[in-house]
Amino acid sequence: PCPLTSGPESESAQEFGRYQCAFPDIEKMKTLITSVQPGDSDNREAVAAHMYFPRLFTYEFVRSDDSNETNGLLNYGYSLVMSEVARKIAEFGYLTEFGIHHDSEKNPFNLACDLMEPFRPFVDAKVFELREQTLNSEVKNELIRLLRTDLPEFGTSLTQLINIFVRDAFHYLSGDDRLPELGFIDEV
């Protein structure tokens, strides 16, 4: 068990404490995250994910277990974010079928799958809050509201942040030298 703090700053301190307790080997994960190379030939992203999900939820948690309620929550949340990203891609006049890393002929949303990756932690954090819930209409509405949630650290909503990121990604892919950033690595 990991002790949580109390006091005037208790809510944010407790939230930090929960994540700190969930990730006692956070330094190892940071090293893995920052050492992922283009193409990830040594599979470091998968190793980090294998460490991440069991620590966030329970050590018995397996991401591929479709019978697990938490996986249902994650899948629903990710599909909402992917849909929003796909909508923005189409809004900017691009096709969702042609991805950068995702390239399945059976996936009509390859590019959306590529560009949604930085937003998965928002879903993960919300599902962490809802982890004791079952996927019903009330919980689905909670996950839908996540898209409109204000993110004080970014000064905007998640939907608007997705819009900015997709726009900046297309500027970069069109030859702009500035790579879009959200700043997640610095905050890990």
Regions found by a protein language model. Give the residues of each.
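Active-site helix-to-loop segments that bind/position phosphate- or nucleotide-bearing substrates
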Residues: 1-188
